[in-house]
Amino acid sequence: KVGTQAVTSQNRIPLIENGTVDIECGSTTNNSERAKQVAFAINYFYTGTRLLVKAGSPIKSVDDLKGRKVVSTTGTTNFQVLRKLNADRNLNFELMGAKDHPESMLVVGAGRADAFGMDDILLYGLKASAQNPAEWAVVGEALQVEPYAIMLRKDDPAFKKLVDDTVAGLMKSGEFEKLYAKWFQSPIPPKGINLAAPMSQELKDNLKALSDKPAL
């Protein structure tokens, strides 16, 4: 029997490392830093950091963040990307941390921050699920493209091969594309929310490449 356990951005890696969780399926970026602690299967999604703002906000790009307040979720790569961007471009925005994505959105909704920086696909989901989606906008170019992958314990090549073979099987058979269309390009019950998110070129390419290459 397969058991499930909810994890957070902060505890997902420790729970894999200590054996509490065998496999983590979520919005987890496969990068070189994390690969020192855990292993990753074949990349199954690609996304980039963008900004969620209130509709009508003057913020249209990261350059508009100068001197403003920005929130992101603690323990995510997005938080690190924004911190580096702030220093590299000398934007002098105040970067705030929130415990999870809904809290980050609430901080912007309450006017305590001007923008929420996060993976664009997660922002599309939060916007679509909001009480009034028209009150929100996802803006700016993606700051970087990062792959998502299933995270599992390090130094267990047999288990990684099992997970890789399973993901590769879905991609080779065409089942992966059917699942993508169902969840990202069709109305989802019970509310009928449609993310209307086209498949990225990076993901299309990886359906053939079957790569587990990390982000830098």
What does each model-identified segment do?
Residues 1, 68-69, 76, 124, ...:
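Extended ligand-binding regions for polar small-molecule ligands
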Residues 45-53, 128-164, 186-209:
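Periplasmic-binding protein-like
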Residues 16-17, 65, 108-109, 150, ...:
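Hydrophobic residues within well-ordered alpha-helices
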Residues 1, 28-29, 46-105, 120-124:
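Bilobed "Venus flytrap"/periplasmic-binding protein-like clamshell domains
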Residues 2-64, 142, 204-214:
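Acidic, polar ligand-binding/catalytic clefts
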Residues 77-95, 135-136, 167-215:
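Ligand-binding clefts/hinges and TM-proximal coupling segments of bilobed small-molecule sensing domains
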Residues 11, 26-36, 81-86, 109-110, ...:
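A ligand-binding cleft/hinge motif common to bilobed small-molecule-binding domains
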Residues 3-14, 95-107, 144-146:
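Short helix-initiation/N-cap motifs at beta->coil->alpha
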